[in-house]
């Protein structure tokens, strides 16, 4: 069993504030852009299935992010973990049986 990150509501609020500041140009960085691009990619993929889930390959997520470091397959799942911790997606299962669901609209 993989242990998932657990944040307090205050930590989630702080992280979302940081992401919104990146969106608004108050903080320089690509982290918010990567999370946003991945969310939009997952939302599109999930909308194509009957049960509203998707299970993209790691390299597909990196291509969607515009990253050329395809050997770093863990990067996409790291961002998925962050999106799940913040409450935007839900992941179930593992490996080929993993399912990703969109749980709420992105607001950062």
Feature map (PLM): residue ranges:
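Short, amphipathic alpha-helical interaction segments positioned at domain boundaries
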Residues: 106-108
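Residue-level marker of intrinsically disordered, low-complexity segments enriched
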Residues: 4-5, 10, 25-26, 87-89, ...
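Winged helix-turn-helix DNA-binding recognition segment
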Residues: 46-103
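Short recognition helix of helix-turn-helix/winged-helix DNA-binding domains
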Residues: 1-60
């Amino acid at each position: 069993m993989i242990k998932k990150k657990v944040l307090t509501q205050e930590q989630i609020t702080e992280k979302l504030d940081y992401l919104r500041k990146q969106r608004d140009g108050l903080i320089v960085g690509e982290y918010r852009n990567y999370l946003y691009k991945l969310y939009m990619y997952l939302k599109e993929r999930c909308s194509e299935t009957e049960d509203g889930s998707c299970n993209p390959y790691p390299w597909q997520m990196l291509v969607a992010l515009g990253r050329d470091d395809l050997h770093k397959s863990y990067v996409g799942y790291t961002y998925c973990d962050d999106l799940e911790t913040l409450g935007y997606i839900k992941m179930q299962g593992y490996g080929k049986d993993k399912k990703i669901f969109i749980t709420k609209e992105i607001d950062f």
